[in-house]
Curated annotation (Swiss-Prot):
<dbReference type="GO" id="GO:0019221">
    <property type="term" value="P:cytokine-mediated signaling pathway"/>
</dbReference>
<protein>
    <recommendedName>
        <fullName>Interleukin-1 alpha</fullName>
    </recommendedName>
</protein>
<dbReference type="InterPro" id="IPR020877">
    <property type="entry name" value="IL-1_CS"/>
</dbReference>
<dbReference type="InterPro" id="IPR003295">
    <property type="entry name" value="IL-1_alpha"/>
</dbReference>
<keyword id="KW-0963">Cytoplasm</keyword>
<keyword id="KW-0964">Secreted</keyword>
<comment type="subunit">
    <text>Monomer. Interacts with TMED10; the interaction mediates the translocation from the cytoplasm into the ERGIC (endoplasmic reticulum-Golgi intermediate compartment) and thereby secretion. Interacts with IL1R1. Interacts with S100A13; this interaction is the first step in the export of IL1A, followed by direct translocation of this complex across the plasma membrane.</text>
</comment>
<feature type="propeptide">
    <location>
        <begin position="1"/>
        <end position="112"/>
    </location>
</feature>
<dbReference type="GO" id="GO:0071222">
    <property type="term" value="P:cellular response to lipopolysaccharide"/>
</dbReference>
<feature type="modified residue" description="N6-acetyllysine">
    <location>
        <position position="82"/>
    </location>
</feature>
<feature type="glycosylation site" description="N-linked (GlcNAc...) asparagine">
    <location>
        <position position="141"/>
    </location>
</feature>
<keyword id="KW-0325">Glycoprotein</keyword>
<dbReference type="GO" id="GO:0005615">
    <property type="term" value="C:extracellular space"/>
</dbReference>
<dbReference type="GO" id="GO:0005634">
    <property type="term" value="C:nucleus"/>
</dbReference>
<dbReference type="GO" id="GO:0001660">
    <property type="term" value="P:fever generation"/>
</dbReference>
<keyword id="KW-0202">Cytokine</keyword>
<dbReference type="Pfam" id="PF02394">
    <property type="entry name" value="IL1_propep"/>
</dbReference>
Amino acid sequence: MAKVPDLFEDLKNCYSENEDYSSEIDHLSLNQKSFYDASYEPLREDQMDKFMSLDTSETSKTSRLSFKENVVMVAASGKILKKRRLSLNQFITDDDLEAIANNTEEEIIKPRSAHYSFQSNVKYNLLRVIHQECILNDALNQSLIRDLSGPYLTAATLNNLEEAVKFDMVAYVSEEDSQLPVTLRISKTQLFVSAQNEDEPVLLKEMPETPKIIKDETNLLFFWEKHGSMDYFKSVAHPKLFIATKQEKLVHMASGPPSVTDFQILEK
């Protein structure tokens, strides 16, 4: 686990150096206080290595933080609705999954001092299937279907929804992310939707089995977001890009208009 530098130890050193320097200058008042002479109190042993809430009265007393994340559900008025810490050892309920996907006022508190390599070294562990044999319709009421030209998807208006591709949505969880990552697998197959670069078609990638842990194959993962009645699938590997449709174009990755990134999940 990465260790947060003890900033207050640095302050103590600066304070000591500053006072030594001041003693050598005759014209400075002996009563003058150092810039670093703040009202910091030493940490008690029982506070070390513990996660503490950071309000105004406590920020000066905390020197080490845990790298577990808190998810804070906040109402539009600013009132905290729900606060919880996500851990691989916790049981996540259906309500939790819906809240994470659906709550547009969710605020993620992340450790700011973590090194990039620490944050990017994320393992996603399989949680469970949350949708089976569902259909994805875009905002133009087009359904996703297989494209005959290769391992691709396209969107079309269907009179018979039985012709649409059926997807299983599988949820994953990690200690570093508080959003809800999912995979989209074509039902009764091992073909997974795989994100590519912007404007490139998504691929249907065959896997030997449903991955129990995803570490390097993050192209298979999408953060499922729900806003009102619409669903969005943001790439974990390319976090500015969403699964999208466009007239006369294969299903691809896009950041927004003119491509359509809004979908509805239709249950079987």
